Design a protein with these regions (language model features):
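Extended, low-complexity, intrinsically disordered C-terminal regulatory tails
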Residues: 39-71, 142-164
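Catalytic cores and adjacent binding grooves of peptidoglycan-active enzymes
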Residues: 94-214
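Acidic/His-rich structured neighborhood in mature extracellular/periplasmic domains
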Residues: 63-117
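Active-site acidic/histidine clusters and adjacent loop/turn architecture
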Residues: 1-58, 120-131, 135
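Glycine-centered flexibility motif
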Residues: 1-9, 67, 79, 106-108, ...
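Envelope-exposed proteins and targeting segments
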Residues: 52-57, 78-82, 137, 171-175
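Long, contiguous hydrophobic alpha-helical segments, chiefly transmembrane helices and signal peptides
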Residues: 56-62, 82-86, 143, 175-179, ...
Length: 214
């Protein structure tokens, strides 16, 4: 399962591609199933070619053999999860030092849980998230509730993809993309699919209510 397991035959995401750069290299968390690596590369290529997105800054995948990480994650254990920064890739190669020290940009107004600062919203982010959600191998994408609400408000009539965009704590500086278990993976247990519908109604309202987050 995503929060308890390991991975055999993991593949390393190349730390540099024409449309992506891996971050926090010292953690050695750029390993995943071949399908996860393939999907990241596909999103990076198509995001640039079709959505005007300069490229991906890729955060943590998992460790070479999966399993629990020393910090930051409960999931990312089975080679099916990746964090991708909301920041677009710059038009130059970042140094090793920059990849360790630069922080992902929060899209929130400081001191708030879900209020977006639209001056920080990158052009094309909507399209990249929609593209990722449209991949059949993607099980769900976790984002801050404020990001989910904005996508709901902007989506128009084409809304089926929104069901995979799930509001979750934090996730204000990156999105968490999770793949389904690979076909034939008898030892892999997938998460239940997202509820039917676009997820923009009562389920989203909870995050903006006075009820404390659980």
């Amino acid at each position: 399962y995503y929060t308890g397991g390991c991975v055999a035959g993991a593949k390393a995401l190349p730390i540099d591609g024409a449309e992506w750069q891996a971050m926090r290299l010292s953690r050695n968390r750029y390993w995943g199933t071949p399908k996860l690596v393939e999907t990241i590369e596909q999103l990076a290529r198509e995001g640039r070619a079709l959505d005007g997105w300069p490229g991906l800054l890729v955060g943590d995948l998992g460790q070479p053999r999966g399993g629990p990480t020393p910090s930051d994650h409960i999931s990312h254990q089975s080679g099916l999860d990746v964090d991708i920064w909301f920041d677009p890739m710059p038009d130059r190669r970042l140094s090793e030092e920059e990849r360790e020290t630069i922080s992902a940009t929060s899209l929130l107004v400081p001191g708030t849980n879900y209020e977006l600062d639209m001056d920080k919203w990158p052009e094309g982010l909507d399209r990249v998230l929609k593209r990722a959600a449209g991949y059949p191998q993607v099980q769900r994408i976790l984002v801050n509730p404020g990001v989910k609400k904005l996508l709901c408000d902007r989506a128009g009539d084409d809304r089926a993809w929104l069901s995979k965009i799930r509001p979750w704590y934090k996730h204000d500086d990156h999105f968490h993309m999770r793949l389904r278990c690979p076909k034939g993976g008898k030892t892999c247990r997938s998460q239940n699919p997202p509820p039917a519908g676009d997820g923009c109604g009562v389920g989203l309202d909870y995050w903006f209510s006075e009820v404390p987050w659980k």
